[in-house]
Curated annotation (Swiss-Prot):
Keywords: Cytoplasm, Glycolysis, Lyase, Magnesium, Metal-binding, Secreted. GO terms for cellular component: cell surface; extracellular region; phosphopyruvate hydratase complex. It comes from Methanocella arvoryzae (strain DSM 22066 / NBRC 105507 / MRE50). Its EC number is 4.2.1.11. The keyword Cell membrane does not apply. Catalyzes the reversible conversion of 2-phosphoglycerate (2-PG) into phosphoenolpyruvate (PEP). It is essential for the degradation of carbohydrates via glycolysis. This is Enolase. It catalyses: (2R)-2-phosphoglycerate = phosphoenolpyruvate + H2O. The active site is at 192 (proton donor), 321 (proton acceptor). Belongs to the enolase family. Mg(2+) binds at residues 228, 269, 296. Its cofactor is Mg(2+). The gene is eno.
């Protein structure tokens, strides 16, 4: 399974922005295809995406000749070569968007050569299903003028199988709309398909909490509530700036801890700005026994930043975004390191997505407890439906154990 051809094209993501799709062909007649997503609220330490036309030009001028003739199943070597060709620590030369699409497409080509689904090729014989974590309401960078908190999330940790888990999140999403409509609130959608009404955070908590309680009662299993605060977007260098108030770091920690207890939150992502390891540690010490304190911008799927978090006891969960770090190997290394030190891992989409379903396979292959991939919208459903298909193969009731 020697790589003998690589093609790339410009396609468009769910926001209508250009992105790159890569095809990798092997000499045994198999191939893999993958596309790069893009974020709206991005961490400063992420792999750098470059303009698509530039990425395609870099592929043709600097990358293809180096990869043709390589063994597609040697993922570590392929990804090492991508780093070597790029020559920077953040893929700012060839582009993290090119590297992640090429790395994932190579893995899919190798899996096809072995006549195996990607999750089994990468992950082995005993996979389990992650719980879906979906955005049902939000604002922030995903919907200007709506809530300060970027995402109000739900996850059905009591669901008996992946089918019911996906269904539960869709019901909560619909129930949120019903409650908003009954309250006379106009419903729009944000980038990820969550409702984006122009309401205060307090009203959003009231509505989502009620929707979760109602649907959980109707289905007969536990559904929990979570947040992506995206606090770096609120931070002005001194305070967290909300529409109607400012909070110091200490006030922000107390505010988030209070919300966790008031609403029995299961998951809080990016509660503090991307460099506040100490603040994350304090919050984790306060509430980490009953809530996942997850770092996204804090860790950016980067081993060196995760190591710093481990040293400081910052958080107890890591958001995993392959395009933040640029390759499948680096993604796996981040997950492996976190797991060694007791961190839960959450595979994640981006706000600008395509119908590429690779992250569904990566979540299963690498044993992530949760997968954050929205609730509705074709580019979100593509991942959720792929999880259902995977569930048919491995047993859709083989849900992972809830980390809390």
């Amino acid at each position: 399974m020697i790589i003998d051809e690589i093609l790339a094209r410009k396609i468009f993501d769910s926001r209508g922005n250009p992105t790159i799709e890569v095809e990798v062909y092997t000499d045994d007649g198999n191939y893999g295809v993958a596309a790069a997503p893009a974020g709206a609220s991005t961490g400063s330490y992420e792999a750098v995406a470059i303009p698509v036309d530039d990425a395609i030009a870099k592929l043709e001028s600097e990358v293809i000749d180096q990869l043709i003739g390589e063994y597609a199943a040697d993922q570590e070597e392929i990804d090492r070569l991508l780093h070597e060709i790029d020559g920077t620590d953040n893929f700012s030369n060839i582009g993290g968007n090119l590297s992640v699409a090429l790395s994932m497409a190579t893995a899919k080509a190798a899996a096809a050569s072995f006549k195996m689904p990607l999750y089994r090729y990468l992950g082995g014989a005993f996979p389990t299903m992650p719980y879906p974590l979906g955005n049902v309401l939000g604002g922030g960078a995903h919907a200007k003028g709506a809530t300060d908190i970027q995402e109000f999330l739900v996850t059905p940790i009591g669901a008996p199988n992946i089918d019911q888990a996906v269904y539960a999140n869709t019901l909560v999403h619909k129930r949120v709309k019903k409650l908003l409509t009954e309250a006379g609130i106009i419903c729009h959608k944000g980038d990820e398909g969550g409702w984006a009404p122009q309401i205060k955070d307090s009203k959003a908590f009231e509505i989502v909490s009620k929707a979760v309680d109602e649907v959980s009662g109707e289905l007969g299993f536990e559904i929990r509530f979570g947040l992506d605060v995206a606090a770096t977007e609120l931070w002005d260098g001194n305070n967290y700036v909300y529409k109607d108030t400012k909070r110091t770091t200490e006030q922000q920690i107390d505010y988030i801890a209070g919300l966790i207890d008031e609403y029995n939150l299961y998951y809080v992502e990016d509660a503090l700005q991307e460099n506040d390891y100490e603040g994350f540690a304090r919050l984790t010490e306060m509430v980490g026994d009953r809530c996942l304190i997850c770092g996204d911008d804090l860790f950016v799927t980067n081993v060196s930043r995760i190591e710093k978090g481990i040293e400081n006891l910052s958080g107890n969960a890591i958001l995993i975004k392959p395009n933040q770090i640029g390759t499948v190997t680096d993604t796996y290394n981040a997950i492996r390191l976190g797991r060694q030190y007791g961190y839960s891992t959450v595979m994640s989409h981006r706000s600008g997505e395509t119908t590429d379903n690779t992250i569904a396979h990566l979540a299963v292959a690498f044993g992530c407890e949760l997968i954050k991939t929205g609730v509705v919208g074709g580019e979100r459903i593509a991942k959720l439906n792929e999880l259902i298909r995977i569930g048919e193969e491995i047993g859709n009731d083989r849900m992972t154990e809830s980390p809390l």
